[in-house]
Amino acid sequence: MGMDVISVIRTKRDRGELSGEQIDWVIDAYTRGEVADEQMSSLAMAILLNGMNRGEIARWTAAMIASGERMEFSSLSRPTADKHSTGGVGDKITLPLAPLVAACGAAVPQLSGRGLGHTGGTLDKLESIPGWRALLSNEEMLNVLDTTGAVICAAGDGLAPADKKLYALRDVTGTVEAIPLIASSIMSKKIAEGTGSLVLDVKVGSGAFMKTIEDARELASTMVGLGTDHGVKTVALLTDMATPLGLTAGNALEVRESVEVLAGGGPSDVVELTLALAREMLAAAGLPDADPAKALADGSAMDVWRRMIAAQGGDPDAALPTSKEQHVVKAASSGVLTRLDAYDVGVAAWRLGAGRARKEDPVQAAAGVELHAKPGDTVTAGQPLLTLHTDTPDRFEYALAAIDGSYDVAPTGTDFTASPVVLERIA
């Protein structure tokens, strides 16, 4: 029997359940260009409004995986472990985490993305290192992984091509927030990537795509279920993104902070989350006795970082770019900093040039925001709260508009408890 896209759209519009055949057909036809963008956006909106059950999401994910190639890491002598973050502000965790987990005995094939909107992209950050290359052939990627234990690079065009098309479409049709589509997008890529185990860092709060713990929990549970159904050992941590992670949001700024963490220093929240995710990855990969804190302290994680950067053409000793212009934002009053909004800081970093509005936009390596205080810290009137960095000073005005109203200072003595970094674990 022939399929037609109108009947598929109507099924979901009328709150029906899509059959496996309908799902397989529509994903394949859309990938081949037989189903038009406007028809797929109509179906995506119906899914956003009416949802999908677990069976539909599993079949949709399987169809996206089947649209392209699957990677194979069975030739490696080490177990593979991977991490995916749903994105946040100052989220540089992949940079110290991949070499740290590799230093403890797992192989970490980290296929990463670029930034879009207020959240930064791992590849943009690493490209601020002179000479470093994000684009590797499958052969080069396996070679780096085999020799250093970790690789961070761009996903090839062959992995889940259906997702690439649908991802770009969701971005411009107001359907980014559909939990079934977020879950299948992330998991189709990760399962096609061939990893044996996966740890999900699902961000919650103003700087995340999931604003509430309930939505984050639903997304995490859906993804853990999908991973398990496809034979990938999957665990999720729900983590706080009400305020930026660490003390920097940008590209070179975050690389510098990541290197500090690998050198045994760095902000406590970045260290805490890096270690929490490392322990989960190592346990999922069958290495529960490995001690990531020791690998940070003894320099072995830093050693893997240096070798990984060099293997991808980068110079680990090169000076990172610094911005031509800075603007300091000072505290207007003395007291306790009780709020510093992650979303607003992310928008400011983006407006300074650290991010892009369209996929083809360039980014400034040195642009971003540096924090001089975090919620819970005591501040004095006139002390620096934030430093804005850019190469184009006419951007300051737009960035300052985002920062305006982004923080609260309460009277000295106000009782304030910072949110924990890790909120929940879902397995």
Each model region followed by its residue ranges:
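Acidic, glycine/proline-rich low-complexity segments that act as flexible tails and inter-domain linkers
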Residues: 1-90, 307-311, 422, 426-427
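Short acidic, glycine/serine/threonine-rich loops at helix termini
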Residues: 94, 112, 119-124, 155-156, ...
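Phosphate/diphosphate-binding glycine-rich loops and adjacent basic-rich segments that engage nucleotide
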Residues: 146-195
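Alpha-helix C-terminal capping segments
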Residues: 49-50, 96-109, 189-194, 229-230, ...
